[in-house]
């Protein structure tokens, strides 16, 4: 039931097609009695109207401008199944604790969208409408994607289960590190970082988002040194290792060339950045599927439209799009690290990545039930300002199916890179052992780490160096229905 309970004002018959301007709610974009079909795509928008603009008219305008409307009545509407194709705003609620903001629920007929195309989907729901003058701000908070639509996508090419089988690693989070500094190293020194980190016990190393092919290190040079390091580390440890080789480039032809070279060298994983765009992401997903390659996505650029609470696109929506588009890894927040990440909201992101079905959970920012129709699961990645002393918190908040990326927390270790990797691996193994023994690893976490450090100098050093490091700031994007406590 609408909190703003205004009846339908739709004008029908010959009056609907008189020349001139008609309000959106009279044109049929406000239908409070509409019951969404199982096949409808539903969007939840946070609408902030300009002062003096009726919130229902603003919500109806969002529905209209993201589907079939233009600024005036057009006679060609009579040549279409207008009643079917018009998006329908059927509910408008004030946002709790946010004066002047409203949640607008809008249903779209499935036939408005091309099968299996994120670019087409986004061209409608985040196209022109975000620049509409009657709105101060607009944010796409969540979407319900019907099974009929989900099934038109291929999803992640590898998935969590097959990735673990390929790596032969089960029962614990995977460990990684982003090579630092992200820019400036020569290929040889870059490869040395990779080798020491993997030999010390990490499962993966990673290129950062902006390392592509620069004067100080050509991409081919980096790939060669990285894969030499991976192969030597595998031989030394007897474990399957990998390094996320960033194939992001100026053109698809360049990206395919780099990905093919990574495959020739024996890499199990390639990496792309979110900024390459939705079509390029889906294209690389198709390549990864054909070539049995894990596809890692760095969410570079996402905060330009996910960070602000009243305008843009929520990261939970980006996560849904990326699961459809088909990536195996996606950076999804750390809770305790240096980057934005409310605990409950981040849990919602992780659930979207890893669950077969997401029930509505307002406390996690999830507004709709979502059936993933057997699409593979994505492995979330936690990266940014985390270290071994937080291991119990990371496992508590993020669970087991996650890649924990300790970049500075490995490479910044006072005893060196390999020691940093050892510290992280020992901390993880100690915490997983305590968990499997049934201990309260969260409350006992510091003691568990201290005991492990007594026989592991690298871990002892890590705990000493980073013992006071926290990033305890108020989150800017928290659930609207729950007050989220700060993370210690």
Swiss-Prot record:
Gene3D superfamilies cross-referenced by the UniProt entry: Ribulose bisphosphate carboxylase, large subunit, C-terminal domain, RuBisCO large subunit, N-terminal domain
Positions contributing to substrate binding: 128, 178, 182, 299, 331, 383
Residues reported in the UniProt entry to bind Mg(2+): 206, 208-209
Modified residues (N6-carboxylysine): 206
Origin: domain of life: Bacteria
EC number(s) given by UniProt: 4.1.1.39
Single biological process term from Gene Ontology: reductive pentose-phosphate cycle
Alphabetized GO MF terms: magnesium ion binding; monooxygenase activity; ribulose-bisphosphate carboxylase activity
Site (Transition state stabilizer): 338
Cofactor note (record): Binds 1 Mg(2+) ion per subunit.
InterPro entries, alphabetized: RuBisCO, RuBisCo_large_chain_AS, RuBisCO_lsu_C, RuBisCO_lsu_C_sf, RuBisCO_lsu_fd_N, RuBisCO_lsu_N_sf, RuBisCO_lsuI
Keywords of this entry: Calvin cycle, Carbon dioxide fixation, Lyase, Magnesium, Metal-binding, Monooxygenase, Oxidoreductase
Residues of the active site: 180, 298
Catalytic activity reported: 2 (2R)-3-phosphoglycerate + 2 H(+) = D-ribulose 1,5-bisphosphate + CO2 + H2O; D-ribulose 1,5-bisphosphate + O2 = 2-phosphoglycolate + (2R)-3-phosphoglycerate + 2 H(+)
Signal peptide annotation: none
PROSITE patterns in the cross-refs: RUBISCO_LARGE
Known cofactor(s): Mg(2+)
UniProt xrefs under Pfam families: RuBisCO_large, RuBisCO_large_N
Other comment: The basic functional RuBisCO is composed of a large chain homodimer in a 'head-to-tail' conformation. In form I RuBisCO this homodimer is arranged in a barrel-like tetramer with the small subunits forming a tetrameric 'cap' on each end of the 'barrel'.
Job of this protein: RuBisCO catalyzes two reactions: the carboxylation of D-ribulose 1,5-bisphosphate, the primary event in carbon dioxide fixation, as well as the oxidative fragmentation of the pentose substrate. Both reactions occur simultaneously and in competition at the same active site.
PANTHER family linked to this entry: RIBULOSE BISPHOSPHATE CARBOXYLASE (PTHR42704), RIBULOSE BISPHOSPHATE CARBOXYLASE LARGE CHAIN (PTHR42704:SF17)
Subunit structure comment from the entry: Heterohexadecamer of 8 large chains and 8 small chains.
Similarity remark: Belongs to the RuBisCO large chain family. Type I subfamily.
Record-given protein name: Ribulose bisphosphate carboxylase large chain 1
Species whose genome carries this gene: Nitrobacter hamburgensis (strain DSM 10229 / NCIMB 13809 / X14)
